[in-house]
Regions:
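Terminal targeting signals and extreme-terminal segments of soluble enzymes
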Residues: 1-275
Length: 275
């Protein structure tokens, strides 16, 4: 796909109010067809931060180091209003708060998610060596790999994934390592940026870390993305790093990769929810 934008999108921007986003059918979530997918909420938070709080003149200097998205209410398939404000703007740190509201029948505007973004000013690493866990050595698929055709079962997927373990014959627990490539714009007519893409991939920490022999039976209440650099290229790799659960509460973490190596992590907390 060589065009500047994808044919399909998760949101249409309101014609009269640039803070209002109208979801398309592609944005529905896996738990309830009347609610939005978590990945589009985290993507929208990143879109807001980048659109209003990372000026073009400062993009080379500011690193989005953390994006936390608390999803404390189901997001209905209705118009979303996104607002943001600067909480702190210092010489080396900038903190942004994002609020996402939805129009709920008989209740009006209701806040359904809140996000906090921490932007840090880039400089140089201090001298010395620090221990880091070993990285995977799995090359991403080709940037020119064709997207699934209309007849392919993946053609209706809201992302394109390739598993490096697809040829392994031994039985494995589901969804441990994947390469993921976006197939939709977040906002119609706007090719998603690298930050928007990785904010959406970050939501994959839930199925990536919390799926097991019976599939996915945890629904995440948040996404917490950490980045020490921006991702490079179309493909982003997810590697399950941690899962722990007790009494129906779980924490799961994935490590994030691109063609140059590891660039961050994503962690979710989740509630047990059998399907």
């Amino acid at each position: 796909m060589n065009s500047k934008v994808f044919p399909k999108s998760f949101f249409e921007l309101d014609n009269s109010d640039p803070s209002v986003f109208h979801p398309t059918p592609q944005s529905k979530g896996p738990w309830d067809p009347t609610t939005l997918h978590g990945r589009v909420i985290s993507g929208l938070a990143a879109y807001e931060v980048e659109r209003f709080h990372i000026p073009e003149s400062d993009k080379a200097n500011l690193q989005l180091a953390r994006l936390t998205v608390d999803m404390f209410r189901p997001a209905p398939m209705s118009a979303l209003t996104v607002k943001s404000e600067v909480v702190r703007s210092g010489r080396r740190i900038k903190v942004i708060e994002v609020k996402i509201e939805a129009e709920v029948p008989n209740r009006g505007q209701v806040e359904i998610a809140r996000s906090s973004a921490v932007l840090l000013r880039r400089s140089k690493n201090p001298p010395g060596d620090i221990w880091t866990p070993p990285e995977w050595e799995i090359s991403p698929p080709s940037e020119n790999l064709p997207y699934p055709s209309e007849n392919d079962p993946q053609s209706n997927s809201i992302w394109h994934s390739v598993s490096p373990d697809r040829n392994h014959k031994e039985k494995k627990l589901a969804l441990k390592r994947l390469w993921i490539r976006e197939t939709h714009n977040l906002v119609s007519g706007v090719m998603p940026s690298q930050l928007v893409k990785v904010a959406q991939v970050a939501d994959f920490a839930n199925p990536g870390a919390n799926s097991g022999t019976n599939g996915l039976n945890y629904i995440n209440a948040d996404v917490c993305l950490y980045l020490h650099r921006d991702p490079v290229g179309m493909w982003m790799g997810t590697d399950s790093f941690y899962h722990g659960s007790d009494s129906g509460v779980s924490v799961g973490t994935i490590t994030l990769y691109d063609k140059e190596g590891r660039f961050g992590t994503s962690t979710v907390c989740a509630l047990g929810q059998e399907r």
